[in-house]
Swiss-Prot record:
The keyword ATP-binding applies. The record marks 18 as: Transition state stabilizer. Pathway: Cofactor biosynthesis; coenzyme A biosynthesis; CoA from (R)-pantothenate: step 4/5. This is Phosphopantetheine adenylyltransferase. GO terms for biological process: coenzyme A biosynthetic process. Belongs to the bacterial CoaD family.
Length: 160
């Protein structure tokens, strides 16, 4: 049986913390689908196609990672992808508190889908896309927190 994992998120923008998790997941699972949620209610900085293109660019070195956009219910998307693992990154207990009901609902909707919580590397344990965007918006240097091509696009978008 192939262990196919889905790592879903808005990834607006995809940070070095996200890249660390997907890189580590690629070593653990046969296939990892980096599933980028449309999330229009979050009013993303980059549209879905832009986020998919940027994520594809920075994960090109990972042959078993496939990047795709989605707007479905997670359990339905996992079924379509024939995935049996759902990866969720957790930085703190507040993330666990948020993720537990989602994991339980996904288990109810698709019992074969197992949720795996992964901790970020220490260097990335405090960053989030929202925090990085806020720093960038105010002219702060975000190069340390984002893959280079994404940092360049964030700067161009926020400070044309």
């Amino acid at each position: 049986m192939t262990n196919k994992a889905i790592y879903p998120g808005t990834f607006d923008p995809l940070t070095n913390g996200h890249l660390d998790l997907v890189t580590r997941a690629a070593k653990m699972f046969d296939v990892v689908v980096l599933a980028i949620a449309a999330s229009p209610s979050k009013r993303p900085l980059f549209d879905l196609n832009e986020r998919v293109a940027l994520a594809t660019q920075v994960t090109a070195h990972l042959p078993n990672v496939k990047v795709t956009g989605f707007s479905d219910l997670m359990a339905d998307f996992a079924r379509q992808q024939q995935a049996n693992i759902l990866i969720r990154g957790v930085r703190a207990m507040t993330d666990v508190d948020y993720e537990m009901p989602l994991a339980k609902m996904n288990r109810h909707l698709m019992p074969a889908l197992e949720t795996v919580f992964m901790l970020p590397a220490e260097a990335w344990s405090y960053i989030s896309s929202t925090l990085v965007k806020e720093v960038a918006l105010h002219g702060g240097d975000v190069d340390h927190f984002l893959p280079a091509p994404i940092a360049k696009e964030v700067r161009a978008r926020l400070h044309p």
